[in-house]
UniProtKB/Swiss-Prot annotation:
Biological process per Gene Ontology, one example term: placenta development
Entry keyword set: Developmental protein, DNA-binding, Homeobox, Nucleus, Transcription, Transcription regulation
Gene encoding the protein: Cdx4
Source organism per UniProt: Mus musculus
Protein name (database record): Homeobox protein CDX-4
Gene Ontology terms: cellular component: nucleus
Compositional bias of kind Polar residues: 110-124, 133-148
Chief place of localization: nucleus
Pfam families xref list: Caudal_act, Homeodomain
Keyword flag Transcription regulation: yes
Comp. bias regions, Low complexity: 20-29
Length: 282
């Protein structure tokens, strides 16, 4: 009686136990002792501990969708799927040739003519009125900006407004101011020699504290000033009625008429004296 109650409880607690047809198994029930009589044998057999691992190598039996891919394959090779069997989504857009390299630009006449035809085939495109408004807006803005571009050159800010005048000398021009002593020494040298030599030029530059270039330029300017003065005197003499050659470059101060050079009053009082030669013969 006690043993049967234990078996019923054991069957409820361990549903995995199975009855054996032979009834010779004594799993789950032990003996009470060595001298006592053993309990009656139960008709249950112990089930395997992990029934869900039974038949794990046989994957074909557990596949509910049909035959598997075969025997055990490499663990690094994923199963291949045949993508050709799956049809792609239906294309609603028209096919565009890939070799057409001249695609119409947005806002161009070709694009405006192409817009309605492509809109008829594509349901997600803009309406015709919207495309026309975009084209008109683009043309309006381009027309509004083009006159301003033509009026304002990108290099207009670089152009400097220069007032054209007859004067060539500017205020920013660097000018050397000679001292009175330097001018006096240069004038003395000019009266002695109108064209200075290289040796004398270097000596003057050292003595006066100037550069040879400054001495050379001073002599050039001094000769130009003298030519201007001579030309001015010649023009004044021609206006008074005299006739003198007007080329000042070929006239030296000794060739000018006596009207330009006044003789001192002391020299005027002298009269030429006739000197008679007397020859004495023995």
């Amino acid at each position: 009686m006690y043993g049967s109650c234990l078996l019923e409880k054991e069957a409820g607690m361990y549903p995995g136990t199975l009855r054996s047809p032979g009834g010779s198994s004594t799993a789950g029930v032990g003996t009470s002792g060595g001298s006592g009589s053993p309990l009656p044998a139960s008709n249950f057999t112990a089930a395997p501990v992990y029934p869900h691992y039974v038949g794990y190598p046989h994957m074909s039996n557990m596949d509910p969708h049909g035959p598997s891919l075969g025997a055990w394959s490499s663990p690094y090779s994923p199963p291949r799927e045949d993508w050709s069997t799956y049809p792609g989504p239906p294309s609603t857009m028209g096919t565009v040739p890939m070799n057409d390299m001249t695609s119409p630009v947005f806002g161009s006449p070709d694009y405006s003519t192409l817009g309605p035809t492509s809109g008829a085939s594509n349901g997600g495109s803009l309406p015709d009125a919207a495309s026309e408004s975009l084209v008109s807006l683009d043309s309006g803005t381009s027309g509004a900006t083009s006159p301003s571009r033509s009026r304002h050159s990108p290099y207009a800010w670089m152009r400097k407004t220069v007032q054209v005048t007859g004067k060539t000398r500017t205020k920013e021009k660097y000018r050397v101011v000679y001292t009175d002593h330097q001018r006096l020494e240069l004038e003395k040298e000019f009266h002695c020699n109108r064209y200075i030599t290289i040796r004398r030029k270097s000596e003057l530059a050292v003595n006066l504290g100037l550069s040879e270039r400054q001495v050379k330029i001073w002599f050039q300017n001094r000769r130009a000033k003298e030519r201007k003065m001579i030309k001015k005197k010649i023009s004044q003499f021609e206006n008074t009625g005299g006739s003198v050659q007007s080329d000042s470059g070929s006239i030296s101060p000794g060739e000018l008429p006596n009207a330009f050079f006044t003789t001192p009053s002391a020299v005027r009082g002298f009269q030429p004296i006739e000197i008679q030669q007397v020859i004495v013969s023995e």
